A protein has these predicted regions:
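Jelly-roll (double-stranded beta-helix
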Residues: 1-312
């Protein structure tokens, strides 16, 4: 057995998307090779409704899949297939855009105004770029989970972990998507298919991964009763850890424990032509997609009554 070393690490950066949603970009719009088959990941965590309520109005996608995982709050969604629904705490939506879909995602938060979730973009292989669009909406109660004797809790969103199968299936890159919470000062190892590329994203607490000499997390200084004291920021510091080759990931949680996503997939190793919400294999395919969008012929499969509007 070999522990996967850390190939690179970084912190998510603040940005704005949609109609003015404040979020943190974990990775994306750069070199896709280290993350193949994944393209982009965002962490949308906000307790200020004015910074997320304008949401992501109607917009197109082609050639990708989007995976939305909600921890807190609600996200209302609709699409050109006629789907309508609401994602709430713990729910997952896996959307395959395929040949083309137009949809909207409108976060509404919870009663306290809190909104927290993640969206991951996965590339589609060349022979599936123009497949029929589809949705998988998974309610929190349908997601497999297990708790080890040491208190480690694992939600299996996609893939297979120790015989627990994720509710999301039928995905070409056969991804593994685990939400893992480890109690304080605990060392764990997780199997990692050698054929896959993958990463961890820490969003609560701190931990050492593999060959790391210092914990990923954040110590902040706050004043209490006139005295400064160091405490562990339980929001985590939005740290991305990308792994090298090996068949296991080793993690030791910090003083306050850790919660992170462990995600992997089989690399496609195909050309990537990417502009905005559309990802194809060549510039010509990309240009054709935008021509169709502007001509009102983008959506190939729509709900009864759906009308393609040029430029939408």
């Amino acid at each position: 057995m070999s522990i996967r070393p850390i190939k690179m690490q970084s912190e998510a950066t603040p940005t704005m998307e949609g109609a003015g949603v404040h979020l943190h970009r974990v990775f994306g719009f750069g070199d896709t090779d280290p993350f193949d088959p994944f393209l982009m990941m965002d962490d949308f965590r906000n307790d200020t409704p004015s910074e997320y309520l304008k949401g992501f109005p109607w917009h197109p996608h082609r050639g990708i899949e989007t995976i939305t995982y909600v921890l807190k709050g609600n996200v209302e969604h609709g699409d050109s297939l006629g789907n309508r629904g609401v994602l709430s705490d713990g729910d997952v939506q896996w959307m395959t855009a395929g040949s083309g879909i137009i949809h909207q995602e409108m976060p509404t938060g919870n009663a306290q105004g809190q909104m927290h979730g993640f969206q991951l973009w996965a590339n589609l292989p060349r022979d599936q770029k123009m497949c029929t669009p589809r949705y998988q909406d998974i309610k929190s109660g349908d997601i497999s989970s297990l708790t080890d004797d040491d208190g480690t809790h694992i939600r299996v969103v996609a893939g297979d972990y120790r015989g627990y199968r994720g509710a999301v299936d039928g995905i070409d890159t056969d991804p593994s998507y685990l939400d893992i919470a480890i109690p304080p000062n605990t060392t764990k190892r997780f199997p990692f298919d050698t054929r896959r590329q993958g990463f961890a994203y820490i969003f609560e607490g701190s931990a050492n991964f593999g060959n790391a000499s210092t914990p990923f997390g954040v110590n902040v200084e706050k004043e209490f009763a006139g005295e400064e004291m160091k405490i562990r920021d339980q929001s985590g510091n939005r740290t991305l850890v990308v792994f090298g080759a090996g068949d296991e990931v080793e993690v030791t949680s910090g003083e306050m424990g850790v919660r992170f996503l462990l995600i992997s997939g089989a690399p496609l190793r195909e050309p990537v032509a990417w502009h905005g919400p559309i990802v194809m294999n060549s510039r010509a395919e990309l240009q054709e997609a935008f021509r169709e969008l502007n001509a009102g012929t983008f959506v190939k499969t729509g709900a009864d009554g759906w009308v393609n509007t040029p430029g939408s």
